[in-house]
Amino acid sequence: MSMLKNLKSPAELKGLSVKELEVLAGEIRTKIIDTVSQTGGHLASSLGVVELTIALHHVLNTPVDKIVWDVGHQAYAHKLLTGRLDRFDTLRQLGGISGFPKREESPYDAFDVGHSSTSISAALGMAAARDCKNGKEKFVAVIGDGSLTGGMAFEALNQAGDQNKNLIVILNDNEMSISQNVGALSSLINRKMTSELVVRLKKEAENFLGHVPRIGKDLLKVARKAEESLKGFFTPGMLFEAFGFDYVGPLNGHRLETLIPALENVANLEGPVLVHVVTRKGKGFEPAEKNPSLFHGVGPFDKETGEVRASKGGPASFTGVFGSTLTAMAEKDDRIVAITAAMLEGTGLKEFSKRYPSRFFDVGIAEQHAVTFAAGLACQGMRPVVALYSTFLQRAYDNVVHDVALQRLPVTFAIDRGGLVGADGPTHHGVFDYSFLRHIPNMVVIAPRDEIELQRAMLTGTQHDGPLAYRYPRGKALGLELPDSVESMPIGKGEKLRDGSDAVIFALGVVCKEALVASDILAGEGLSVAVVDPRFLKPLDQQLLIAEARRTGVVVTVEENVRQGGFGSAVLEMLADEGLAVRVLRIGLPDRFIEQGTQQQLYARYGLDAEGIAASVRNFMHHDRGDASSTALA
């Protein structure tokens, strides 16, 4: 009989023995492996926290008590324990459950996450709200050691300690960043100190020593120094105690018989407490334990062998082209340095890091620092290339404006995962960068339509004396044969790809490919539609675009970005400034967060594939007035 299938709510965990909970942990791991082997997802992180998740739900009264998961990569066991077993096979699929905690999905999901280092801030805010209402519920932030490289986490630790809030922070140390398990003695010392009685006795002893005549304060200082020296010698606890937290741990995150009592003791303590739990990423699946980075975010794989199913041949990815090209460029230009924020492999920079270790910087999950660090490099004559996912560049917006663009520094931004990314959904789609970059003074923004244009954009970036960004998508490139050498692009110059007399499509970025196919479809219906690749979001090629708009009288803009403030808006502004009365249809993403699904499903749903573009143009041409996505200038 399956314990997982019969579990109605996490409250039932309180009635199970440790042996039964261990059986349940095994069933959860099996279900996660079975599902992710089919759907893909964040496997290693979730396998590493199965026992921790069980222990938290065993000790806490969820959903009254709240667990805030940092990033959310590790939340699969949490989802299985909180009523989503029957839908777990839809994980990360169109219309299915999210790969991250999502408040609208379950009352057990306390906070929507997807980006790193936010959990302590959110949980602290919830604790402050509780105190305003004189509540008693508990709030727990679960954060990985990698996420602690984000400065926001330390900002929250600082406030929590200063305000002495009742808050529990679980540091999930999966041996990837901070520390190894530091041994039995340290574990024993700290585990003994979790007892509520011991903590109370410790405080009473401090009070007693403090009141001893004449020498009391000196005795108290000596006692505290002795305690700190002993613990600091064996553990990293002093760091967190300096923030005003009581430190507990390290604890073995896979031993329920010790983890549960420790958490029960911690739950009754006053003030902020940090519990250091050591886990193994990929626990229970040998291939993931041996290669946790590969199985961090993984596609479908063979669950018997762990072999990841290779995609069907085809061209290299845009990311791969970027990485190999930058490595080759760095051989010819020793000013080029590469910077990423804990995304070495994701941004394609592994080979660069091996070839040029002194010119490669992984700054951790610290996008703000990455950008200003690059600004410092640029000040001293280097040509830094900051490689970030579009969604994470959002976190460094002020640094882009204030520290780079304001000084017109030659920093290049390689914006990966631009546009719709697929199964990771709304937290990871890169659909706002056109809008938040194009209004920044001194900024040049390029959206290459293919891998050759990407190479040209990269060369342009390292030659340009000012900030420049180029944006490319997730997934395979077009399969074009790459030349031995490329030329840089003239700033602000687009290219006409196809002539036509009835209308013109301005398609920015990789949607050029779909626009050309749409033009073919429409040609078969008797409509002659030109296609222009503007290349540059900023500055626009006004001479080319205005000439084409004036010639045809009908303009269609296509972009893989929200329509608000994006490329279509830039074209409208240009035409309005010119006083040119033409009909304009903007095709892009609507004013809402876009759900998860495959890239192809989402392109079709939002009319960004060839058929969708052709249908929109057809309808626009056959009606005197367009739909809500169109704008007429008169």
From Swiss-Prot:
| Reaction it catalyzes | D-glyceraldehyde 3-phosphate + pyruvate + H(+) = 1-deoxy-D-xylulose 5-phosphate + CO2
Q: Specify the pathway.
A: Metabolic intermediate biosynthesis; 1-deoxy-D-xylulose 5-phosphate biosynthesis; 1-deoxy-D-xylulose 5-phosphate from D-glyceraldehyde 3-phosphate and pyruvate: step 1/1
Q: Which GO terms describe its molecular function?
A: 1-deoxy-D-xylulose-5-phosphate synthase activity; magnesium ion binding; thiamine pyrophosphate binding
The UniProt entry's coiled-coil ranges are none
Q: Give Gene Ontology CC terms.
A: cytosol
- Give the family from UniProt: Belongs to the transketolase family. DXPS subfamily.
Q: Any idea what job this protein has?
A: Catalyzes the acyloin condensation reaction between C atoms 2 and 3 of pyruvate and glyceraldehyde 3-phosphate to yield 1-deoxy-D-xylulose-5-phosphate (DXP).
**PANTHER family in the record:** 1-D-DEOXYXYLULOSE 5-PHOSPHATE SYNTHASE-RELATED, 1-DEOXY-D-XYLULOSE-5-PHOSPHATE SYNTHASE, CHLOROPLASTIC
What is the protein's given name?
Answer: 1-deoxy-D-xylulose-5-phosphate synthase
Species annotation: Syntrophotalea carbinolica (strain DSM 2380 / NBRC 103641 / GraBd1)
